Amino acid sequence: MAAAAARPLVTIQTLDGDMSTDQSSTVVLPDVMTAPVRPDIVNFVHAQISNNSRQPYAVSKKAGHQTSAESWGTGRAVSRIPRVPGGGTHRAGQAAFGNMCRGGRMFAPTKIWRRWHRRVNVNMKRHAIVSAIAATAVPALVMARGHKIENVPEMPLVVSDSAEAVEKTSAAIKVLKQIGAYDDAEKAKNSIGIRPGKGKMRNRRYISRKGPLVVYGTEGSKIVKAFRNLPGVELCHVERLNLLKLAPGGHLGRFVIWTKSAFEKLESIYGSFEKPSEKKKGYVLPRAKMVNADLARIINSDEIQSVVNPIKKDAKRAVLKKNPLKNLNVMLKLNPYAKTAKRMSLLAEAQRVKAKKEKLAKKRKTVTKEEALAIKAAGKSWYKTMISDSDYTEFDNFTKWLGASQ
């Protein structure tokens, strides 16, 4: 009892007409509301159990084969696919039977002996429901799912047991307005629309958003008839909580309205972290891997700091090895004479370049202006002699080309 008293308390929302002396105003928060939220388990279990409501379907065994088609064989310059016999119609001569043919059967026709149902471990299903129940107590997850809970006084929302005595839908609407949950029911009502696609022809014409889920604790309660005609509002007995209702589509955070009797039964149905469940044999609530989310506080605690090794301030790091053939400073550390050797090689190279230039300059003689004019005159006289001695002067076509006319 001491551990239970230390747990948070949830306020019970009273309704009009309730006697203040009839019931206590608070109830202890059950451990199932603080269980770890596991969306991975919820998504997997929801995907598996949602398959169990499927109806087997298959195409007809005769589909695509209701004709006496035969292949024409080879020699007609057409494919060997079976062809419809006869004449006088477009159908005659058309290919049949194959999955590539118009009017043919499908590839691998579906059979009704497919494995439609999926088996899920009992403990995994229980963990999924516990996670979904815990998510209903987190306002952020409920709002992220799209529920209108701005006017709701507290999460989880618990109402008095007088709500289970409500018989009329008008009284049920009044109850929802008192606890601030009518906005969500109104949202579900206004979201009714026609389904896109062919589902509208197959008894699935309308779709709508999900409203609040009312969980009651008394078997045969009148609350079922009062709330069942409200669009989007669903009801469920606390002992028959279903993941398809607690997390529709595999998405956590359904807006749940609990009655007091249903909320008090959660402890006995799902147990606690120390005590197993009374209704589910051997089931104990899963514990969170990390109870305290403040990681800095955990690391800096005396218990952990007392066994943690001190910081190594003189850590020896790997030395970066540099290539001495490319890095001069590293080469000088290895061979101090390398600097002198490099300088001597540079000076020797400069000396070789200088000697080469001097040698070339010495070979090149400087010509005076008079010598240049004499060389030019000698060239002209040689050219005239060459023209006069040429046989081409006898032809008129070449005289101008040889310059003889000049």
Curated annotation (Swiss-Prot):
Can the keyword Transferase be found in this entry's annotation? no
Q: Which InterPro entries match?
A: Ribos_uL4_C_dom, Ribosomal_uL4, Ribosomal_uL4_dom_sf, Ribosomal_uL4_euk/arc_CS, Ribosomal_uL4_euk/arch
Instruction: Write the record's keywords in alphabetical order, separated by commas.
Output: Ribonucleoprotein, Ribosomal protein
Q: Which SUPFAM superfamilies does the record associate with it?
A: Ribosomal protein L4
Q: Where is this region: Disordered?
A: 56-95
Q: Which domain of life is it from?
A: Eukaryota
UniProt GO MF annotations? mRNA binding; structural constituent of ribosome
Q: Name one GO biological process term.
A: translation
Which Pfam families does the protein's record reference?
A: Ribos_L4_asso_C, Ribosomal_L4
- Gene3D superfamilies, per this entry? 3.40.1370.10
Per the record, its GO cellular-component terms are: cytosol; cytosolic large ribosomal subunit; cytosolic ribosome; nucleolus; plant-type cell wall; plasmodesma; vacuole
Q: Where in the sequence is the signal peptide annotated?
A: none
PANTHER family under this entry? 60S RIBOSOMAL PROTEIN L4 (PTHR19431)
Q: Which family does it belong to?
A: Belongs to the universal ribosomal protein uL4 family.
What's the protein called, per UniProt? Answer: Large ribosomal subunit protein uL4z
Upper lineage: Eukaryota, Viridiplantae, Streptophyta, Embryophyta, Tracheophyta
Gene (name only): RPL4A
